Amino acid sequence: MKNYIVFDLEWNQSANGKERSVPHFPFEIIEIGAVKLNENFQMTGEFHRLVRPQVYTQMHHAISEVTHMNMKELRSSGELFPDAAAEFLVWCGGDAVFCTWGNMDLLELQRNMDYYHMENPFPKPLLYYDVQKLYGLFCRENARISLDSAVEEQNLMEDRPFHRALDDAYYTGKLLTMLGKTPGPDAILPFKSVDYYRLPSDKKEEIRMTFPGYSKYVSRVFDSKEDAMADKGVTEMMCYRCGRMLRKKIRWFTPNQKTYFALACCPDHGYLKGKIRMKKVEDESVFVVKTLKLTDEEGAQSIIQRKEDVRKKRAERNRMKRKQKQAVKKAATASPADGRSASSRRRRKSKSSITTKDV
């Protein structure tokens, strides 16, 4: 039987700044909290463990301030992370569907497991439900808000504080239960999220998903942005309704080297707008998340206008560069002439200083 595991983590970090962090291990988990929901989105159980830190053994002041935890409590009541994580996975069961508020918790869970050389039991790709995303999609016109704001907005407050793992998991579970009733499972369950901790290792593993209203593609890792944008799989635009490969009306362009846009038109389904987000990997290589979405005439015009704005800004930058080069060149050619003029003035002054007495 399928269970929804709604979990939350609290973590600590270097108390002496990022430069003192352990490479590839910026956050150390100090608390695991979770609630279990059945297929009807009813809560059936809770899980909670404190974790005894082994790496960052001094509490970062901001973490202590938010969570109200201290190192004495963690040392006396916490378990070693491998033990706590193993117990958590056993409690989850084999048919678990993970749910979190935001996209950080699964990533940090796996990063901590890797640090302690634990086997990663999750499937690849790892699909989960981002309840923050679902709430924004169905309750806030795609706007993302904080957990406490969503709970307050839905009048779900209880005598439980925020910023502790079990309490945050509980409130996230309450919101998921609410969404499971309205708009209901048929509406929310198609919108799975993809965890990016373990990326596709080759072209065969690249991820292509279709949702109500858009499609998503997650690429393998590329050495550079240029390599990514030279790949046909990255830049192609296919209508997710009929599978037709489309010719672009507006080729991929970027206003900031991080996000790219394009526009195509399907003969049967109309305009299709594309968005590519370049995401860095720790070694400065990149992977691509591409979304394609059908749009109307107004949406198409917004892409066309954005492209024109980028063209104007680029033209203005080029004009300023040419102007600066001309100014530098003019200054360089003017300097020798000024030098000769000064010499001439000195010679004329020297001659004019000769008097008749000298003669």
Predicted regions and their residues:
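Conserved non-catalytic scaffold segment of RNase H-like nuclease domains
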Residues: 1-107, 271-313
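Short amphipathic alpha-helical surface micro-motifs
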Residues: 11-17, 30-33, 108-112, 218-222, ...
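Intrinsically disordered, low-complexity segments enriched in polar/charged residues with Gly/Pro
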Residues: 20-23, 149, 224-226
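Metal-dependent phosphoesterase core characteristic of DEDDh/y 3'-5' exonuclease domains
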Residues: 25-32, 36-67, 90-218, 283-287
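Short loop/turn and capping residues at structural boundaries
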Residues: 75, 124, 161-162, 250, ...
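Short Asp/Glu-rich motifs
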Residues: 83, 170, 258
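Acidic two-metal-ion nuclease catalytic site recognized across multiple nuclease folds
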Residues: 178-359
